[in-house]
Amino acid sequence: KQLRGLGNALAEYHPVIEVIDRKFTWSVGREKLKHPLIYIQDSIANKNAMFNINIESEQVAKYRTQNVIAHIPSKKMCAKTIVFTAHYDHLGRMGESTYFPGGNDNASGTAMLITMAKYFKEHPSDYNILFIAFAGEEAGLVGSKYFVENTPIKLKKIKFLLNLDIMGSGEEGITAVNSTLFEEEFNLLNEINDEKKLLARIKKRGPAANSDHYWFTEKGVPAFFIYTMGPNKNYHDVFDTYEELSFVEYDDITNLLVTFVERLEKWESLDWYN
């Protein structure tokens, strides 16, 4: 990480070529370097080769995009809300020919968001259900930050938020970020999983600023960031395609989360939970 930071710093003064021994990945930047920063795999760095690079770069400082929000009202009067979120942006292109599909990150989570919306439209909840597809996650959780700072709802009315990001596998189970903060709800997930025998495991993980749940957590909203674990390691690269995803536990994860919301409804009648 220190070397990566050094490369960025040096590129403010002159072009930089950095030889790396890690996988090529791509990301979205919100600032434009003054000079090129070029990465070369160490496997070809020592070969006698010459190449020319023509780089054209433009920073669109005020690019406009949007969050997409949908709402299903509760089947009876209820002031509390369950929120499902997923970011629908990815990395786009690098030049004319290099395209980053973002199958797992995060077309898979966006698909599950739509699956949840379809389910709760057909099976209304005692809660209000809010669905948010965020833009700008890859650029630094921009869409979710904007929503929290300009929210059309009272955040204190959110009973729980479930953020769906990287949902395309599951052979090794799922991880629940923030589960160390919300032990009762994490135990409920495991209780449901043990009862229904859905997933290999539900891994506990502490808070992290790595997806759109983060800004909600900072405002005191109870939230989990759920992501799948499995053999597919294609992340922020050109190989993150639909064809590489197994979706082997997609239905089971849907079952788990739907049941989680339904069990929270039952908890509402218990004094200790309110």
Predicted features along the sequence, with ranges:
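Second-shell loop/turn segments in exported
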Residues: 1, 56-58, 96-106, 133, ...
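Active-site-proximal beta-strand/loop segments in catalytic clefts of secreted hydrolases
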Residues: 1, 19-22, 41, 72, ...
